[in-house]
From Swiss-Prot:
Reaction catalysed by this enzyme: (1E)-4-oxobut-1-ene-1,2,4-tricarboxylate = (3Z)-2-oxo-4-carboxy-3-hexenedioate
Name of this protein: (4E)-oxalomesaconate Delta-isomerase
Origin species: Novosphingobium sp. (strain KA1)
UniProt keyword terms in alphabetical order: Aromatic hydrocarbons catabolism, Isomerase, Plasmid
Family: Belongs to the PrpF family.
Enzyme Commission designation: 5.3.3.-
Gene3D superfamilies: Diaminopimelate Epimerase, Chain A, domain 1
Root EC class: isomerase
GO BP of this protein: lignin catabolic process
Keyword Membrane: no
Function as written in the Swiss-Prot or TrEMBL entry: Contributes to the degradation of lignin at the level of the protocatechuate 4,5-cleavage pathway. Catalyzes the isomerization of the double bond between C4 and C5 in (4E)-oxalomesaconate (OMA) to (3Z)-2-keto-4-carboxy-3-hexenedioate (KCH), where the double bond has migrated between C3 and C4 via a 1,3-allylic isomerization.
């Protein structure tokens, strides 16, 4: 385990729910500059490695063991830089190998609350550079009277109640981690005897039919997590595709995500059960949803074979998941390439103070 600086035993922090995840939001200046010291500090903050994370702030779940590191940007046209860090629950690992579109939902409000971005009218647009992949997202935050409000009438599945909407636009996300939308160059690859699509439109994913790995694709999260045979099968595929996806050895990485697709049951475009990567997701990650939605548009792919895709250049695809759905709006050009994606998220400030280790 990395050793942390014993002189650093606390830091200012805001704990927020972002989308269907939650975690700690820090200003970059409030964390150790040295990466190893920073990671050791964050492991202590979360209480990792420990399956219960009992001595830290983590919630014994990858979805609640996340960190956003935010700073004012010096890039033209960008307001803030955002680094996402996934803190493993039961291993002493902190990784920046992926983005998180759910935690991203809290970055705009946090930046305004911390004075990195000035509120401008009833709505404030915040341009966010995602350091993990070098891409840009623009979040629109409600700021009536010059202050962030978290109250509103927007609902997202997986989160009780309603909150202020935070629409977020993504552009140029294709190949953000893998170098190409289809890093292997193929719409379909056969891995361990199964047809899969290796895709990266903001999140590296392996998309395959649920039926091909012996499930329906409609199981609940607990059933999936209890299925050791299924998890071993998809983990073998995940490890086999690391090099094909230009990700190298993915043994200790949180990508690629594993997406098991089935025909929609509730009027959506496709039904998905996702692994992140070793545990089933309660919903689906934002950028994972973008990648799956994009896969639905690729002729001959496993996703396209089960999906119901609307017509038109602007397509709204409802991605069904274990606790509801997530709608992803894709814009395609004349050649059928996805040029932008937009999703609706919400966020809420849970705590603002000092975290101790």
């Amino acid at each position: 385990m990395p050793r942390r600086d014993r002189n650093m035993d606390s830091a200012p922090c805001m704990w927020m729910r972002g989308g269907t995840s939650k975690g700690g939001y820090f200003l970059r200046a409030d964390l150790p500059a040295d990466t190893a010291a920073r990671d050791a500090f964050l492991l202590a903050v979360m209480g990792s490695p420990d399956p219960r994370q009992i001595d830290g702030m983590g919630g014994a779940d990858p979805l609640t063991s996340k960190v956003a590191v935010v700073s004012k940007s010096e890039r033209p046209g960008i307001d803030v830089d955002y680094l996402f860090l996934q803190v493993f629950v039961d291993q002493a690992i902190v990784t920046d190998a992926q983005n998180c579109g759910n935690i991203l939902a809290g970055v705009g409000p946090f930046a305004i609350e911390r004075g990195l971005v000035a509120a401008s009218g009833d709505e404030t647009r915040v341009a966010i550079f995602m350091e993990n992949t070098g891409q840009v997202a623009v979040a629109t935050v409600r700021t009536p009277g010059g202050s962030v409000t978290y109250a509103g009438d927007a609902a997202i599945d997986g989160v009780p109640g309603t909150h202020a909407p935070i629409p977020t636009e993504f552009r140029d996300t294709a190949g953000s981690s893998c170098g190409a939308l289809l890093p292997s160059g193929n719409a379909v690859d056969v891995v361990n005897g199964l047809p899969v699509t290796l895709i990266d439109n903001g999140m590296p994913c392996v998309v395959m039919k649920a039926a091909d790995v012996g499930i329906t694709g409609y199981e609940d999260r607990d059933s999936l997590d209890a299925n050791a045979e299924l998890k071993a099968k998809i983990e073998a595929i995940r490890l086999a595709v690391g090099e094909l996806m230009n990700l190298g050895d993915v043994t200790e990485k949180s990508v690629p995500k594993m997406m098991l697709v089935a025909p929609p049951r509730d009027g959506g475009a496709v039904c998905v059960r996702s692994f992140i990567p070793h545990r089933a997701h309660a919903t689906i990650g934002v950028l994972g949803a973008v990648s799956v939605a994009t896969a639905c548009l690729i002729p001959g792919s496993p996703a396209a074979e089960v999906a119901v895709v609307p017509e038109g250049a602007r397509k709204t695809l409802s991605i069904e998941h274990p606790t509801g759905e997530m709608s992803c709006v894709l814009e395609v050009d004349d050649a059928g390439n996805v040029v932008s994606a937009a999703l609706l998220r919400t966020a809420r400030k849970l705590m603002d103070g000092v975290v101790f280790v």
